[in-house]
Every structure is written in structure tokens, then in C-alpha cells.
Amino acid sequence: MWLRCPHCHQLLFAKQLTQYAVCPNCDYGLRIPARHRLSWLVDSFKEFDKDLQTKNPLHFPGYQEKISKLQRQTKLNDSVLTGEASINDQLFSLGIMDPTFIMGSLGTVTGEKITRLFEYATTHRQAVVLFTASGGARMQEGIMSLMQMAKVSQAINEHAAAGLLYIVVLTDPTTGGVTASFAMDGDIILAEPHALVGFAGRRVIEQTIHQQIPIDLQSAENILHHGFIDRIVKRQDEKKLLEWLLKTGSVANE
């Protein structure tokens, strides 16, 4: 099976890819399901809130059927996987957004799961690591999805007030309401190489300002250059770096 890297457009043979699903030519991390990332990222994992279900608050036509189909395909109840994880005996609270579940969009269940994750971490005095991947707020849930931005941010504020560490890893893509809220609230903000990070999409921006924008305007490398994030980390180095950050953060918090 062949595929083309979305970043460098190199034609890749699927067997060339390692477990990390990284382009060997440019280090771009292909979009992967949350459970795939979990398989190599942590040593142990206890899942939270796996039975939460959306109630389709706006009775959007076809929405419930789409959710049910994606739940069967991804083995997730919504667009984020949350739980308590460990790396080399370092316990922490972990959230991984899944770009294969309605493009990781932020709905009521996703917002509730992330809020509960921070509440658990605050109660148990744990750091939070959150991998973001999202197209933004979920249109099928309207204003209810937008309210999740404020709800999650409040839980983050309480976690921060307790003096606890919050690490964000921006993956491709991180856009819309997720970027405008909890994706940029971290104490430490990392990003994968060439990840798309922004608010509005390229086409929307160009149609609004009536001019073209630089091709790399919303790249992880460009936002690092302008000081919006702390570091770009290759996918295969994430576990080792997170272990060091969690250990350093736990010592500082003692």
C-alpha cells in the first residue's frame, strides 16, 4: 500500500512507516487514532468516562447515526481518550484527542471528559498531558460546543491554582476553538514537526483579507519562531521528553 506525505508529498510505502507513523523524509507525523498513539506512549493506562454519550442536543439530522458509526470504528465514545497513565512509574493524567473522530471536534462529551480529567488531576495532585488534534468546535452541537471552551478553561485555572503542571502537545491539526482555549493554556507547549496550528483555516483567512498568506504561516515551526510554543519534538522522542518533564515538574512541586 502506498500513501503520500501531506507535508513533503513524498510517495511512501506503508511498510516504510514505523509504529510512530512518521514520514522518513521530513519527520511529519501522520494523523493517527488516539489508541494508536497510546500504544507506544505510556507504560500503563486506566481509561476514564468511557460510557459518556452525547444526547444530540440540537437533534441534528443524521448526527446520532454518524456518532454511532464512529464509535464502532474507533472504539471511543467521542473525540478524546482520557485516563490515568504512567511513564517509568510517573503517574499523570492523560488526554489524547482523535483526529479520526469527526476531526477531533470539540463537543459536549469531549469537553466534559477533558474537564473531568483536570478535576481528577487537581484532586489527586497530578500533572496533565494533553495531545490536541482538532478542527474546532462541533457544529452539530452549536452553542453547547462553544461553551466547552470556557468550561475546560475554568478547570485548567483551578488545576493551575493548585500549583500543578499542564503540558500540551500540539499535533496536526490543532485549530478553531481548541486553539483559542485549552491548547494554548499549557505551562509547557510542545508541537510535532510541521503540525498545522491556527484558528481559522487558510482558505477562510484568504477570503477575508483578499490576499494570499505565507504557506508556512500556521506551521509549528513558524509559531515557534514567534514565541507561541516552547519546543518542537519528534514523535519518537515524545515519551522520553515527557518522562523528563514530569519528573522535573514533580520535584519542583514537592
Curated annotation (Swiss-Prot):
<feature type="binding site">
    <location>
        <position position="26"/>
    </location>
    <ligand>
        <name>Zn(2+)</name>
    </ligand>
</feature>
<dbReference type="InterPro" id="IPR034733">
    <property type="entry name" value="AcCoA_carboxyl_beta"/>
</dbReference>
<dbReference type="InterPro" id="IPR041010">
    <property type="entry name" value="Znf-ACC"/>
</dbReference>
<keyword id="KW-0808">Transferase</keyword>
<feature type="binding site">
    <location>
        <position position="23"/>
    </location>
    <ligand>
        <name>Zn(2+)</name>
    </ligand>
</feature>
<feature type="binding site">
    <location>
        <position position="5"/>
    </location>
    <ligand>
        <name>Zn(2+)</name>
    </ligand>
</feature>
<dbReference type="GO" id="GO:0008270">
    <property type="term" value="F:zinc ion binding"/>
</dbReference>
<dbReference type="Pfam" id="PF17848">
    <property type="entry name" value="Zn_ribbon_ACC"/>
</dbReference>
<keyword id="KW-0444">Lipid biosynthesis</keyword>
<feature type="zinc finger region" description="C4-type">
    <location>
        <begin position="5"/>
        <end position="26"/>
    </location>
</feature>
<dbReference type="InterPro" id="IPR029045">
    <property type="entry name" value="ClpP/crotonase-like_dom_sf"/>
</dbReference>
<keyword id="KW-0443">Lipid metabolism</keyword>
<dbReference type="GO" id="GO:0005524">
    <property type="term" value="F:ATP binding"/>
</dbReference>
<dbReference type="GO" id="GO:0016743">
    <property type="term" value="F:carboxyl- or carbamoyltransferase activity"/>
</dbReference>
<feature type="domain" description="CoA carboxyltransferase N-terminal">
    <location>
        <begin position="1"/>
        <end position="254"/>
    </location>
</feature>
<dbReference type="GO" id="GO:0003989">
    <property type="term" value="F:acetyl-CoA carboxylase activity"/>
</dbReference>
<dbReference type="InterPro" id="IPR000438">
    <property type="entry name" value="Acetyl_CoA_COase_Trfase_b_su"/>
</dbReference>
<keyword id="KW-0862">Zinc</keyword>
<comment type="similarity">
    <text>Belongs to the AccD/PCCB family.</text>
</comment>
<dbReference type="GO" id="GO:0009317">
    <property type="term" value="C:acetyl-CoA carboxylase complex"/>
</dbReference>
<keyword id="KW-0863">Zinc-finger</keyword>
<feature type="binding site">
    <location>
        <position position="8"/>
    </location>
    <ligand>
        <name>Zn(2+)</name>
    </ligand>
</feature>
<comment type="function">
    <text>Component of the acetyl coenzyme A carboxylase (ACC) complex. Biotin carboxylase (BC) catalyzes the carboxylation of biotin on its carrier protein (BCCP) and then the CO(2) group is transferred by the transcarboxylase to acetyl-CoA to form malonyl-CoA.</text>
</comment>
<comment type="pathway">
    <text>Lipid metabolism; malonyl-CoA biosynthesis; malonyl-CoA from acetyl-CoA: step 1/1.</text>
</comment>
<dbReference type="GO" id="GO:2001295">
    <property type="term" value="P:malonyl-CoA biosynthetic process"/>
</dbReference>
<dbReference type="InterPro" id="IPR011762">
    <property type="entry name" value="COA_CT_N"/>
</dbReference>
<comment type="subunit">
    <text>Acetyl-CoA carboxylase is a heterohexamer composed of biotin carboxyl carrier protein (AccB), biotin carboxylase (AccC) and two subunits each of ACCase subunit alpha (AccA) and ACCase subunit beta (AccD).</text>
</comment>
<dbReference type="GO" id="GO:0006633">
    <property type="term" value="P:fatty acid biosynthetic process"/>
</dbReference>
<keyword id="KW-0963">Cytoplasm</keyword>
<keyword id="KW-0547">Nucleotide-binding</keyword>
<keyword id="KW-0275">Fatty acid biosynthesis</keyword>
<keyword id="KW-0067">ATP-binding</keyword>
<protein>
    <recommendedName>
        <fullName>Acetyl-coenzyme A carboxylase carboxyl transferase subunit beta</fullName>
        <ecNumber>2.1.3.15</ecNumber>
    </recommendedName>
</protein>
<dbReference type="Pfam" id="PF01039">
    <property type="entry name" value="Carboxyl_trans"/>
</dbReference>
<keyword id="KW-0479">Metal-binding</keyword>
<keyword id="KW-0276">Fatty acid metabolism</keyword>
